[in-house]
Amino acid sequence: MKTLYRDNKGLHHWLFACGAVLVLFYLIRGNRAAVNFWVYSVTLPFEQFLGRACAALPFSVAELLYVLAAVTAVVLLVLMVRYLIKSRQKGRAAYRCALFVLDLFLTVCAAFSLLWGANYYADDFCDRSDLSPEPVTYEDLVRVTQYFADHLAEASMHIARDENGLFTADRQEILNYADTVYDCLYDEFPFLDMPDQKPKGIFFSKIMSAMNFTGFYFPFTGESNVNMDSPAMLLASTCAHELSHQRGITSEQQSNFLAVLACTRCDDANYNYAGWMLGYIHLGNALYRVDPDAWQQIRDSLPDEIVLDLRYNSAYWAQYKGLTATVTQSLNDKMIKSYGDELGTQSYGAVVDLLVNYYA
């Protein structure tokens, strides 16, 4: 045993260092004041610095790192297999390889916990705004759903459509507008005021679709990244959602709420449509589970072109239903829950409570 430790001293020190960071994170996460300081005075400014640095590049650095990580993983696998085959002491060689892989894994876990995981234990948007997702009444749910349907119909009159009657827009123009979409919220929520970095489109967007993702925030580069292949009608609200993560907001329900609020208040027609659409989809899904007849009545009041957009969106995502999407979403759900968010990915549906309480 001593020989194993001595022969792999560097790897063991690396392991202990990662373990110490994770233990320290576990012990400190219950101290709200300490976590708030760490998040809002250390990691958030650091991620904003990274975001500004990466903004100078026309491509997603996050996507490049994912590709490099995948290539590196394949190369390391080949090298380790070769090392194991050539080694005379198979057991020691296997131990060294396993220790190296464990070190890499724990390094990523420790870095992610410090840069992003800590945000789950800091004051969130609801804490800082005094808004909370209180339970809502059936009457309020119906009223707010109708309110969103009416405004969605109005917003639909101001956007462009293609020859098939579907929403159409220049996707790059949507991305270019994104860094101003939150300006309309600063008076009401001054703590949201910060310089935004425009979201970046992902080159391998079809892979994102297969994984059932429309966007993601990458704390190691401070970049918001969006799917450029999924239906364009919700691209603007996806941009706004991911920009909320640049502000350290981890809760998906709060990010969706802010996306709706920012999009519907800004002065861009494409963002207005996406905001009312996102809100209507969440509210409509909630109402359908409670009263399908009431949902149908509101759905029937929508103009045909909006129904066409909704059907196109459903058809697009239906083609990607399968094992990949299921596994990816399950892993994402477990990751979110591991940081104390008991709702996991179901917290996406809790945006309804925030919307109804705010608009009722």
Task: Outline where the language-model segments fall.
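Post-HExxH zinc-binding segment in Zn-dependent metallohydrolases
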Residues: E139-R143, F148, T250-A294
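N-terminal membrane topogenic signal
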Residues: T3-L15
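Pan-zinc metallopeptidase signature
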Residues: E305-A360
